[in-house]
Every structure is written in structure tokens, then in C-alpha cells.
């Protein structure tokens, strides 16, 4: 797997989970001898919603809610076969979405 790069993108609603998962991935990759760039924090995506409090009248009375999606980006440069196997066996929390691209 010479001259290849693995790009890992993590998404989660809880920043503690995503930081913990990023640390596990970095430790695993470094243990197998790969070079890691990151984790780089990407901008947090904030979705805001307005909901009517009352089902009938009082149009001006509303609740405001938001969902924050935190993102991290990592590059693993010159991964070995051991690196790929270790990353495949890695168990991450359920609230973290992982996207892996080979470049």
C-alpha cells in the first residue's frame, strides 16, 4: 500500500465521543507504524428549528431547538497492512459516524 493515503472523517452530535474516537484511531495507527495527520476539527454544523408551542393559538409563542454536528478529519499517510487490519477491528462508540476513503 505504498504512496496511498487513508482519509477518515468522523461526525457526531457529542464532541466528547468524537474526540475519544479520534484519539483511539490515532493511537492505533501510530502503534502500527503509520504517520497520522490530525485530527483536524472542521466547522460545527448547526441546524436550528422553530416549533409552535401551542396547537391552536399564540402564533408568537415558539420553542427554538438546535442540533450541532461536530466533525473531525484525519489523514493516515503510508498505511501498512497491519494498520488497515487494526482499523477494521477497532470498536468505536455507536454515536460516531465514520467515513473512510482511500486515496
From Swiss-Prot:
PROSITE patterns: RIBOSOMAL_S10. GO terms for cellular component: ribonucleoprotein complex; ribosome. Pfam families: Ribosomal_S10. The keyword Ribonucleoprotein applies. The keyword Chaperone does not apply. One of its GO terms (molecular function) is structural constituent of ribosome. Keywords: Ribonucleoprotein, Ribosomal protein. SMART domains: Ribosomal_S10. PANTHER family: 30S RIBOSOMAL PROTEIN S10 FAMILY MEMBER. Part of the 30S ribosomal subunit. Belongs to the universal ribosomal protein uS10 family. Involved in the binding of tRNA to the ribosomes. This is Small ribosomal subunit protein uS10. The lineage of its organism: Bacteria, Pseudomonadati, Pseudomonadota, Betaproteobacteria, Rhodocyclales.
Amino acid at each position: 500500500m505504498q504512496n496511498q493515503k487513508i482519509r477518515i472523517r468522523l461526525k457526531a452530535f457529542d464532541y466528547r465521543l468524537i474526540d475519544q474516537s479520534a484519539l483511539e484511531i490515532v493511537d492505533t495507527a501510530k502503534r502500527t507504524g503509520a504517520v497520522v495527520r490530525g485530527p483536524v476539527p472542521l466547522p460545527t454544523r448547526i441546524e436550528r428549528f422553530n416549533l409552535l408551542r401551542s396547537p391552536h393559538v399564540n402564533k408568537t409563542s415558539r420553542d427554538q431547538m438546535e442540533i450541532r454536528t461536530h466533525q473531525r478529519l484525519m489523514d493516515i499517510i503510508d498505511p501498512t497492512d497491519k494498520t488497515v487490519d487494526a482499523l477494521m477491528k477497532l470498536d468505536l462508540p455507536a454515536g460516531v459516524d465514520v467515513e473512510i476513503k482511500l486515496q
